[in-house]
Amino acid sequence: YQICKAFRDDPVTSLHNPEFTIVEWYRPSFSMENLMNEVEEYVQTVVSCGKILRYSYQEVFEEKIGLNPHECSLDEIQKAAYTHLDIGSKDLRFTEYLDLVMSEVVEPNLPEFCFLYDYPECQAAMATIEIDDHGNQIAKRFELYCKGKEIANGYFELTDPIEQLRRLTSDNIERSKKGLPEIPIDERFFAALSAGIPKGSGVALGLDRLLMVMGDFEEIDSVLSFSIKRV
């Protein structure tokens, strides 16, 4: 595990500062569900929230949007975005429409404290993909939301070096299309995967955002010693 600074060059908002603090840990032989239990116990030690509710990504998406995110087409998710949001005529990929609808329509209506789990395959990132009881390919990934804030992001980790390389290559192709620099291959990471590492789960939790929840703050600036606004 480690507690460290992380950096992400996204727009500055009430929830995001380019430099922020995370606690990240990995559990060999832990399932995704095991790690969700541990994250819940961790949060309950500092926040009075009771039992944290759990919903599949499909469950909340179907309830609010009326579409199965694992089966709907690009046209269907595009239509849903245009129906619920004033976004003009954007030409986005399927996963980008999913992100947009989830963040702008679904997330604001989530309970105060809840987990979302089993994400669409296209949003697997570095999570393992499995087949659910309905034959859908789902990413074994979860996120924790507290009072409207995404607090944690966890995976049942992908340990297959061939699949990891395929995903990185695919991501770099998309980055090149957008004029973004490619992400270099981490040779030591792939060497470790090739040597064989145990299956398990890992999570990154935003400590600044957790402090916001603990203190009922609306601005991340309120819990930082030196935010980008005051540099």
Set out the residue ranges of the language-model regions.
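Acidic, low-complexity central loop/insert segments
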Residues: 32-57
